Amino acid sequence: MSREIPRPPELQRDVDFWIRVYSQITTLQGFLHDERNLAIVYSTVDLPPTERPGSPVRRQLIDNERTRWADALREAAVATEQGAAPSGADALRALELWGADATPDTLRAAAEAVRFQLGQADRFRAGIVRSGQWESYIARTFDSLGLPPELAALPVQKPGS
């Protein structure tokens, strides 16, 4: 029995996205990205540290950025349909990100699929620190159950922490 967790190649772009969420950006940042193609990250949004999570100020900032990218994707769709280059920098960036997949229909659909993902790097690090006291117990338990030791990293972030 292989102890390695399978990683199908078709999931690699999604794995890479989540690695970035849990290692590069904190809960004071987030990615605006395509909800289906996680390789498409439009921008990183910096959130005001003085505002609570879910505050109206934060929500408005995220909504404004989401609208900005949805508008850029619609502009890129129209330009692509007309065989022209878009004039806006964001629309040009959207075309660059989508590459050969940048058809008018794809870009219009993407305009409706701009999603925000809050960073988790600070929570993840804190979870690793918290789990340190249980490390040897978890390792022994996983070994006795024949589970891959890499699974021990999964519970380091409890929801809502």
List the predicted regions and their residue ranges.
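Secretory-pathway/luminal and periplasmic proteins that interact with or process carbohydrate-rich
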Residues: 159-161
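Cell-wall glycan-active module
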Residues: 1-155
